[in-house]
């Protein structure tokens, strides 16, 4: 059953969009690893989200597509609320363990020049 994998990814995006930084403790495993950032643990997610929301307080991530296979979800999103540019897109891959996100890989057009 892949429902728990889809639910974990959906919880993550809902928490990010609601600026619910404390939810990271419940969404990510204690040994969570972000491959793009090279950071570990839910505390690193909390800090990253806080910094991002300070710069872009109106940001919202919109899920465009999600494909789930086994313990992995691949998600294509668009990012709204970043002024002065075309909405960036992201492709993120999550590995879920025991209902929580354990690993993240990702690509984003956010850092590219517009």
Locations of regions flagged by a protein language model:
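C-terminal and inter-domain tail/linker signature
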Residues: 1-114
């Amino acid at each position: 059953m892949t429902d728990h994998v889809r639910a974990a990814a959906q919880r993550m995006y809902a928490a990010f969009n609601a600026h619910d930084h404390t939810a990271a403790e419940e969404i990510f495993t204690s040994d969570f690893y972000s491959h793009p950032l090279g950071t570990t643990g839910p505390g690193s997610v909390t800090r990253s989200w806080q910094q991002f929301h300070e710069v872009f307080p109106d940001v919202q991530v919109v899920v465009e597509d999600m494909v789930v296979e086994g313990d992995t979800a691949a998600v294509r999103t668009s990012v709204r609320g970043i002024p002065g540019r075309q909405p960036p897109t992201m492709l993120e891959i999550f590995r879920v363990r025991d209902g929580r996100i354990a690993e993240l890989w990702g690509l984003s057009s956010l850092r590219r020049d517009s």
